[in-house]
Amino acid sequence: KGFFWYYFETNDRDPVIEKEQSAPCRFIDPHRAARFPFRVSYFGNRINFEVFHGLTDGLGALRFASRLTEHYLELKKNLPVITEEKEFSPLKEDDYLRYYRKLPKRHYESEPALQVSGEFLPFDQMGILKGTLQVADLKAQCRKYGVSITKYLAAALLWSVIRTETDGKNLKKPAALNLPVNLRSFFDSETLANFFAVVNISWPKGRAPENFREVLTNVSRQMDEQIVKERLEETISYNVSNEKKWYVRAIPLFIKHLAMELIFLRTSRAHTMTFSNIGPAKIREDLREDVEDFELLVGASPKQRMKCGAVAYDGKLCLAFTSAMAENRLPEVFFRFLEDQGIPVEQESNGITDREHDKGRYPVIAQDRRKIKKAVRMFYLSLVFVSV
């Protein structure tokens, strides 16, 4: 990091590849793992690519993970290695600046949203519960309602949140989804650096919806209004214009960091959870049968205790919930709703919060909760003793 801004430097070290031994989405320490802002590991026949969000977004990470998988199979099967000299050069492009236009100022407001309730998991643990379904089954249901897959799934998630976190009659706070939008779909861009925006899709506080169709109609309208090029240009303008202000550029980085932490805390409170659908993963045709599936795991945070990632491959869609909570009420209600709608779901977990669907394809992470709670109490007791 510099005095005013963070920046990336070229790293000529070799990345360290390790066997997965812990829960996913751990903090990536920039001073370890040969100082790379990403982590590559394996477990059984699964390849993991975890990345710091400042380096790339979900689509960029998917592109790299797909190519990494292809290259592994090329080496394993002794196939000719296909290389493209400029395959990942667009990582240096900043298309936020490229498509920035100075527009009239727009004021953004947010209010605290419903939070997923329940007991937290111990330190350094993350529960995974994923459901795999056939894209054809999902599309058939979407056609009945006349909506896209993302609209249908976002509405189903909101409906599940309302059913699990309210009395079904009134909402004291809005139920809100943080929905990332791939800007490459609206602007001419091939960058692998971050190029996305987020929109807030919610059901307002007050009267609860009577049925799923009511939620779907509301979600569909919001997405039609917000996910259009004109509104996304306003978002780019708002974000970039703040970076361009001379007094912001002159503020030392440690003060910027504190301000960004406060902004992140405030904005994260405005969403119940994040739902990221990055679309289909692509593997070259002669290697498709060697790859079973892809999954997208989005790290949970203190204010967004559960998140959901979706990625499709070979006619199947994987919906993966990552959770810092000890209960699975929300994903269980969500998957049950899909099955009630005529969409069979095959579930799998990493065994931390759900033993029934654990197939042994994730590392075993055993921790004694009583010992952890005792250690936490002793830690705070020692702080009190030192302060006295």
Regions from the PLM with identified roles:
Residues 128, 195-279, 286:
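Helical lid/core segments from catalytic subdomains that handle acyl or acyl-like groups
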Residues 1-16, 81-133, 179, 185:
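Short amphipathic alpha-helices and their capping loops
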